[in-house]
Amino acid sequence: MTSVVVVGTQWGDEGKGKITDFLSADAEVIARYQGGDNAGHTIVIDNKKFKLHLIPSGIFFKEKISVIGNGVVVNPKSLVKELAYLHGEGVTTDNLRISDRAHVILPYHIKLDQLQEDAKGDNKIGTTIKGIGPAYMDKAARVGIRIADLLDREVFAERLKINLAEKNRLFEKMYDSTPLEFDDIFEEYYEYGQQIKQYVTDTSVILNDALDAGKRVLFEGAQGVMLDIDQGTYPFVTSSNPVAGGVTIGSGVGPSKINKVVGVCKAYTSRVGDGPFPTELFDEVGDRIREIGKEYGTTTGRPRRVGWFDSVVMRHSRRVSGITNLSLNSIDVLSGLDTVKICVAYDLDGKRIDYYPASLEQLKRCKPIYEELPGWSEDITACRSLDDLPENARNYVRRVGELVGVRISTFSVGPGREQTNILESVWSNI
């Protein structure tokens, strides 16, 4: 029984897809356990970029099984489009499995997402308007439609009529918006269900059978710990649990079967949308990092907010996700800076604190306390070991590991697979 969970430790966009793709080479099953098509991940293979939103990164290994678990909310329209995209690129999807217990995102979820966001005015949380939150709301309210329901014509029709009647009352009475028509949704989405039917199964059986047989299973999270609905910067969070604990709920695999948790982070910090960001940069250094790091959302295209590495955030993520190994990405983006900074603590009303406050009001008053390190001017994109790095870059990597309190297993100096360097195999000693 061998399993590894990959989680983002910041606000998403840490390079989880790249690391999952890298670790997939030694895995036999790769599974997603939460989120939806609001999260994008980019994989570079032979200098060609592939952008995915729903399908696990492991799909590019045709001999390995890729799983969309029950904790994922699936937009069938987006999924069919993504399948067509992969087929057009010559990628087989015969190795894909989709949980029959996963919930479905429908047009009324997306419409409600937009209406709710617009109604917030200046208090918007920066949702991607993909219907993720409303779909999870329906799931919690026990009125959601699951993949198993989508495949049954009569069941789907009955539940769609009930849900649509309720949502239309909401649209008309509360938001003064036009209702949606049953006929505009039913046939289209039922057909999407038929197109994905070949992939649908009880994925908890596949995952547990694989683990019981001693196979290596890799779990791929979406977003990041700081976007977790319980442990993140609430309410500026997603509607699911990206933390490692979300694996057990979102995949149907018990906690006793999880061996290691790899936390993925960048050598700096970024986030999309609104919400607290203590180390955010508003100067030329921030602009430089954004442009060199190509910090624009995979899903939205929005410019990401960027800032210095925050070890307070990272220690919070380590604690709530039980991180055992760290993968440090995008070190190359910091090349050329005279000085690099790491936030080691916060100043809250004149008092030094080492924890991440839950209160948004306290976070607004938190000022980062920085440790400054000398930068490096060398191009490090061809470095293939820690010893290859310039001394200052090497010291930066080591200091990050010390402050977070987790050993660094891999570090990357660019987007390519060959630019990911192993310091310690996460598959060993399990």
UniProtKB/Swiss-Prot annotation:
<feature type="binding site">
    <location>
        <position position="142"/>
    </location>
    <ligand>
        <name>IMP</name>
    </ligand>
</feature>
<keyword id="KW-0479">Metal-binding</keyword>
<protein>
    <recommendedName>
        <fullName>Adenylosuccinate synthetase</fullName>
        <ecNumber>6.3.4.4</ecNumber>
    </recommendedName>
</protein>
<keyword id="KW-0963">Cytoplasm</keyword>
<dbReference type="InterPro" id="IPR042111">
    <property type="entry name" value="Adenylosuccinate_synth_dom3"/>
</dbReference>
<feature type="binding site" description="in other chain">
    <location>
        <position position="238"/>
    </location>
    <ligand>
        <name>IMP</name>
    </ligand>
</feature>
<feature type="binding site" description="in other chain">
    <location>
        <position position="302"/>
    </location>
    <ligand>
        <name>IMP</name>
    </ligand>
</feature>
<dbReference type="GO" id="GO:0044208">
    <property type="term" value="P:'de novo' AMP biosynthetic process"/>
</dbReference>
<keyword id="KW-0547">Nucleotide-binding</keyword>
<dbReference type="InterPro" id="IPR042109">
    <property type="entry name" value="Adenylosuccinate_synth_dom1"/>
</dbReference>
<dbReference type="GO" id="GO:0005525">
    <property type="term" value="F:GTP binding"/>
</dbReference>
<feature type="binding site">
    <location>
        <begin position="12"/>
        <end position="18"/>
    </location>
    <ligand>
        <name>GTP</name>
    </ligand>
</feature>
<comment type="similarity">
    <text>Belongs to the adenylosuccinate synthetase family.</text>
</comment>
<dbReference type="GO" id="GO:0004019">
    <property type="term" value="F:adenylosuccinate synthase activity"/>
</dbReference>
<dbReference type="GO" id="GO:0005737">
    <property type="term" value="C:cytoplasm"/>
</dbReference>
<dbReference type="InterPro" id="IPR001114">
    <property type="entry name" value="Adenylosuccinate_synthetase"/>
</dbReference>
<feature type="binding site">
    <location>
        <position position="40"/>
    </location>
    <ligand>
        <name>Mg(2+)</name>
    </ligand>
</feature>
<feature type="binding site" description="in other chain">
    <location>
        <position position="128"/>
    </location>
    <ligand>
        <name>IMP</name>
    </ligand>
</feature>
<feature type="active site" description="Proton donor">
    <location>
        <position position="41"/>
    </location>
</feature>
<comment type="subunit">
    <text>Homodimer.</text>
</comment>
<dbReference type="Pfam" id="PF00709">
    <property type="entry name" value="Adenylsucc_synt"/>
</dbReference>
<dbReference type="InterPro" id="IPR027417">
    <property type="entry name" value="P-loop_NTPase"/>
</dbReference>
<feature type="binding site" description="in other chain">
    <location>
        <begin position="13"/>
        <end position="16"/>
    </location>
    <ligand>
        <name>IMP</name>
    </ligand>
</feature>
<dbReference type="GO" id="GO:0000287">
    <property type="term" value="F:magnesium ion binding"/>
</dbReference>
<feature type="binding site">
    <location>
        <position position="304"/>
    </location>
    <ligand>
        <name>GTP</name>
    </ligand>
</feature>
<feature type="binding site" description="in other chain">
    <location>
        <begin position="38"/>
        <end position="41"/>
    </location>
    <ligand>
        <name>IMP</name>
    </ligand>
</feature>
<feature type="binding site">
    <location>
        <begin position="298"/>
        <end position="304"/>
    </location>
    <ligand>
        <name>substrate</name>
    </ligand>
</feature>
<feature type="binding site">
    <location>
        <begin position="330"/>
        <end position="332"/>
    </location>
    <ligand>
        <name>GTP</name>
    </ligand>
</feature>
<dbReference type="InterPro" id="IPR042110">
    <property type="entry name" value="Adenylosuccinate_synth_dom2"/>
</dbReference>
<feature type="active site" description="Proton acceptor">
    <location>
        <position position="13"/>
    </location>
</feature>
<feature type="binding site" description="in other chain">
    <location>
        <position position="223"/>
    </location>
    <ligand>
        <name>IMP</name>
    </ligand>
</feature>
<feature type="binding site">
    <location>
        <begin position="40"/>
        <end position="42"/>
    </location>
    <ligand>
        <name>GTP</name>
    </ligand>
</feature>
<feature type="binding site">
    <location>
        <position position="13"/>
    </location>
    <ligand>
        <name>Mg(2+)</name>
    </ligand>
</feature>
<dbReference type="InterPro" id="IPR018220">
    <property type="entry name" value="Adenylosuccin_syn_GTP-bd"/>
</dbReference>
<keyword id="KW-0436">Ligase</keyword>
<feature type="binding site">
    <location>
        <begin position="412"/>
        <end position="414"/>
    </location>
    <ligand>
        <name>GTP</name>
    </ligand>
</feature>
<keyword id="KW-0658">Purine biosynthesis</keyword>
<keyword id="KW-0460">Magnesium</keyword>
<dbReference type="GO" id="GO:0046040">
    <property type="term" value="P:IMP metabolic process"/>
</dbReference>
<dbReference type="InterPro" id="IPR033128">
    <property type="entry name" value="Adenylosuccin_syn_Lys_AS"/>
</dbReference>
<keyword id="KW-0342">GTP-binding</keyword>
<comment type="function">
    <text>Plays an important role in the de novo pathway of purine nucleotide biosynthesis. Catalyzes the first committed step in the biosynthesis of AMP from IMP.</text>
</comment>
